[in-house]
Design a protein with these regions (language model features):
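Extended recognition/assembly regions associated with phosphoester-bond processing machinery
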Residues: 1-190
């Protein structure tokens, strides 16, 4: 692995949170416990470099009755609904505080239920919700939206975090097609 990869004293990895959805489609049910955990690691020793990896399926864009496998037209509205969901407020507050804490890094890895996070408007909205205009907080977030995974060193160990859908033939993301969609959006093409 590359020698220029980040090094941390501690790395915590959580996968498949699936924030969002209404009624029976809402998978995540323990906002207070997750918020407590995020706050706990944010307030560990201020001298230690700590990373929190949300390892895919952070937001569940598929958790509603009318879900499409990829819905760029409604993605920002769906993300807004997740941020506005009162049942999830504790988690968002804890994540906002986490990225405002020195020596803390939040790493977001794309999964197969939150592909829309890679779309420019959705990424912008997500970062605005987490950081507002706090550039220091923004500098503590890493986005891994290209299927490369997140690699780092923890003490002498090498760590690689991938969501895992890339080895599941039923849930593979076509990253080249996603890149073409993003290019078209950035260039104002239909």
């Amino acid at each position: 692995m590359a020698s220029d990869q980040p090094t941390y004293d501690e790395v915590y990895v959580i996968s498949d949170i699936h924030l969002g959805g209404q009624g029976d489609f809402q998978i995540f049910k323990d906002s207070q416990r997750l918020a407590w955990f995020i706050k706990h690691i944010a307030h560990l020793s201020a001298e230690r470099k700590i990373a929190l990896v949300l390892n895919g399926d952070i937001v569940d864009f598929l958790a509603d009755q009318d879900a499409k496998c990829f819905d760029p037209m409604r993605a920002v509205a769906k993300l807004e609904a997740v941020f506005d969901n009162l049942a999830l407020q504790d988690v968002w507050i804890a994540l906002r505080d986490f990225v405002r804490t020195k020596k803390r890094t939040l790493i977001l890895v794309l999964g197969n239920h939150d592909i829309e996070l890679a779309l420019p408007a959705v990424t912008h909205h997500l970062l605005w919700e987490l950081c507002s205009d706090d550039e220091s907080a923004r500098g503590r977030i890493m986005l891994i939206f290209d299927n490369s995974g997140f690699s780092c060193s923890v003490a002498r160990a090498q760590v690689l975090c991938v969501h895992g859908n890339e080895v599941d033939k039923y849930n593979i993301i076509d990253y080249e097609a996603l890149r073409h969609v993003i290019v078209a959006i950035n260039r104002g093409l239909d």
